[in-house]
Amino acid sequence: MAIKATDLSAIIKAQIKDFNQNVTFDEVGRVITVGDGIALVSGLNNVEYGELVQFESGVLGMTMNLEEDLVGIVVMGDDRSIVEGNLVKRMRQVISTPVGDELLGRVVNALAKPIDGKGKINTSYHAPIFKVAPGVMARQEVNEPLETGILAIDAMIPIGKGQRELIIGDRQTGKTAIAIDTILNQKGKHVYCIYIAIGQKNSTISQIVDILNKHDALKYTTIISASAAESAPLQYIAPYTGVTIAEEWMAKGKDVLVIYDDLSKHAVAYRTLSLLLRRPPGREAYPGDVFYLHSQLLERAARLNKENGGGSITALPIIETQAEDISAYIPTNVISITDGQIFTKESLFNSGQRPAIDIGYSVSRVGSAAQTKLMKKVVSSLKLELAQYNEMLAFAQFGSDLDQNTRNILEHGAKVYELLKQPQYSPYEQIKQILILFCSKYRLINPIPKAYITKYRDELLNYFLTNSKTLQVISQLTKASDWTEELIESVWEHIMAFNESFIPTIPNLNKYQGQEIPPLPWKAYKK
């Protein structure tokens, strides 16, 4: 079919109309060498440090070394598609991540791309992952508790919103379990959680996703996975992606919990990059700026003042030690950056004391200011009692001829350690914790043999939650801001009533010579 002259002229006119005279310029370089996730590129004379570049294959990279003739680029993906001579294009932007509520309940990689098969994440805003931490004047003091639901931590090593608390210990001592329990305990507390897995096995990450799903905790959690299968550059940027997502929520006044699991593997990934980029190695072959690597990350955890939104980021970094050596390079670095540490011990774990927290080594430098008065007063003497117990235990090994006072300290300390044992994935609400600790403070566990303490604790909590009179006491505790003599007497009398029903159920009790329960101090004084 012949084309008419009028049709031809109309087509030409349409093409002329759409013709664009603008010329686009791209600054490009060429790959000189590539391998081990590092590409050396020449020709990118104006590229900036930390800028994104794109290879011919579509893979992204980030500039990390700026030399006289060459640029060292870390490849954010598979470097097997890159060959010598490929063009590399400047993107004139820094690495950024999508942020927003759309990321809740999702599992993403280090670049915040979804890997959970639930479809695309449609966010309207991206934020650069490398930022300066909030300044001194933008912050306020840490004075609100972040409840972990773990009795030993909330009682003796309390964590506040905006704090950085290190979890440190050997492998397989329950570090991740503490972090996961803390996420589970945030249910209904309006705290968003971000779990960043660095160098973990994919099977472990999948297991954590299943646990959070099972306990209905995934809906307020984002999981960032940079597994052992990922390249070192992706493991390096994963924590920064996580804290950037958290900062967006903090700016909107939300409270966020960020868990870095773990920063030992993060430091190893950065060491790998630095050595491949031919940077000079320092102690333990880590580069000189490995302290700054973690300090710039953890300083972004803060509690903002009201003028800046009033939100907070609480950071729980995890560090794995070798043979309990907390004086190694990375552990000492992170201990000095954080506001305290929770030290997990293998010997405690193997003896059945779980969570295996070593109270002597563990400390919280700012969290005690965040404790409620109800909690603070029931734990006032707990750490001292356990310190005395551990000291006496060492002496008791040398001989059996102990005076009554020493035997009382040893017996009470052993019972307190039993009270502190807690099954995994079952965090306690604060009221339950207060009731348990009340029994210890006022020696209401004196007549109970050590073997029955766990049963006693569980049945006591059940008694308080199912009895109409005790539910009134729980209501009073919930509303109270501080202890009064009347409130203490009320709780004491109800626990004594429970003791009267529980003690006869203990078999062979007549063989057990337990201590008597002392009267309340003011009642003894009035007598």
UniProtKB/Swiss-Prot annotation:
Residue(s) at site: Required for activity: S362
GO MF entry, a single one: proton-transporting ATP synthase activity, rotational mechanism
Any one GO cellular component localisation term in the record: plasma membrane
Gene3D superfamilies in the record: 2.40.30.20, ATP synthase alpha/beta chain, C-terminal domain, P-loop containing nucleotide triphosphate hydrolases
First-tier enzyme category under EC: translocase
Compartment list: Cell membrane
One Pfam family, short name: ATP-synt_ab_C
Keywords (A to Z) from UniProt: ATP synthesis, ATP-binding, Cell membrane, CF(1), Hydrogen ion transport, Ion transport, Membrane, Nucleotide-binding, Translocase, Transport
Its EC number(s): 7.1.2.2
Annotated membrane topology: Peripheral membrane protein
Binding site for ATP: G169, D170, R171, Q172, T173, G174, K175, T176
Catalytic activity: ATP + H2O + 4 H(+)(in) = ADP + phosphate + 5 H(+)(out)
Function as written in the Swiss-Prot or TrEMBL entry: Produces ATP from ADP in the presence of a proton gradient across the membrane. The alpha chain is a regulatory subunit.
Family listed: Belongs to the ATPase alpha/beta chains family.
Quaternary structure, from the entry: F-type ATPases have 2 components, CF(1) - the catalytic core - and CF(0) - the membrane proton channel. CF(1) has five subunits: alpha(3), beta(3), gamma(1), delta(1), epsilon(1). CF(0) has three main subunits: a(1), b(2) and c(9-12). The alpha and beta chains form an alternating ring which encloses part of the gamma chain. CF(1) is attached to CF(0) by a central stalk formed by the gamma and epsilon chains, while a peripheral stalk is formed by the delta and b chains.
Protein name in UniProt: ATP synthase subunit alpha
Phylogenetic lineage: Bacteria, Bacillati, Mycoplasmatota, Mycoplasmoidales, Metamycoplasmataceae
Gene: atpA
